[in-house]
Amino acid sequence: MPPPREPRRCRSSPRHRRTTTLKPPKVAAAHAALADVGLAPRALFVHAAYVLNTASAEEEKARRAASGLAKEYERTTALGAFGCCFHPGSAGESAPEDAAVRVGRAIAQALEAVPETAGGTRVLIENTAGAGKTMGRTPEEIAIMLAQVPAALRHRTGYGLDTCHLFAAGHPIHESAARLREVLDAFERTIGEPPAFFHLNDSQHPFGSNKDRHALLGEGQLGAEPFRWLLEDPRTRGIPCILETPSERTEVADDDATADPADARMVALLRGFLGT
C-alpha cells in the first residue's frame, strides 16, 4: 500500500492561483453534494491557495496576492460557505508590523470587492507553523493583522487554529489538558474572540520544529491525547473541527463518495473521544 498523503481540502489544487468564477451549475452541484451527506453550505470552509503571500514586502507580489485572495473570497461567497481561510504569508525582510498592514489591506480589499451576504461569509486567518518569517504563529501576530481591517468590516473576519501548526510553532498543547486550555485562552484573550474553526492534524515533526507536515491523529509527535483534551474543551462545541490528515487513496474521482480508510479511522477515533 502506498504511504498516506494529504488529501485535497481546497476547491482545487491549493498550490496554484485560481482565476475562474464559479458558474451556477457548479454551485448547485456543490450544494447537492453537501445535501447528500446532510450538510448545509454554511458547514463548508474553503482553503485559499497556499501561494498567496499577502504579507510580502514586494509590491507586485503583494498586489497579486491581494487580488487572488479577493477572487478566492468571491468564489467562497458564491458557494454560501462559512468562510475562506488563508495563510498570511511571509514578511520577508520587512518588519512584522508592516507586513500586518499589508495583510489587513488584502483582507479589506477582498471584503470590499464582494457585497456582504445573508449569513456573512468570512475571511479567516489560519495560524501558521512559523517557518522563516511567516506571519500568524502567535496570537499577537494574528491580533495585529486583524486590527488593520477597518472597523466596519471586522465582523466579517476571524481566525482558525490548526493543531499541527500550534505544536510546530511552540505552543505546548501536548503537555496537558491545562496547558492546552492556556494556549486557547491566550488566543481568545489576545484576539478578542474564539476561533471560528479548528484543523485537526498530528505532526510528523517534533515540538517547536516550525515544520508544517501533517500526520494521522495519534500517529505523529503530538499523540492522541491532545485531541481528546481539545474535544473536551467547551470551546469546540458548535465550532467546526476539520480533519486535514493524510489520506490513503491517492486518486479519487469527483463523484466517488466512498470514505477514505484513513479518514474513516480518524472519525472513529474522534467519535470514541466523544463517546458517540
Regions from the PLM with identified roles:
Residues M1-V46, L52-K71, T276:
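N-terminal pre-domain/capping segments
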Residues R8-C10, R42-A48, C84-F86, V123-I125, ...:
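Hydrophobic faces of well-ordered beta-strands that scaffold small-molecule active sites
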Residues S13-R15, A49-V51, G89-A91, E126-G130, ...:
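Active-site beta-loop-alpha junctions enriched in small/polar residues
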Residues R18-A29, S56-G68, S94-R105, K133-I144, ...:
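Alpha-helix N-cap and loop-to-helix initiation/capping positions
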Residues P24-V46, V103-A118, M145-P150, Q221-D233:
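Alpha-helix-loop-beta-strand connector modules within alpha/beta enzyme cores
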Residues T54-G158:
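Active-site acidic/histidine proton-transfer and metal-coordination neighborhood
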Residues M135-A143, F167-G238, P246, D254-P261:
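Gly/Pro-rich active-site loop or hairpin
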Residues V252-T276:
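C-terminal helical cap(s) of enzyme catalytic domains, especially alpha/beta-barrels
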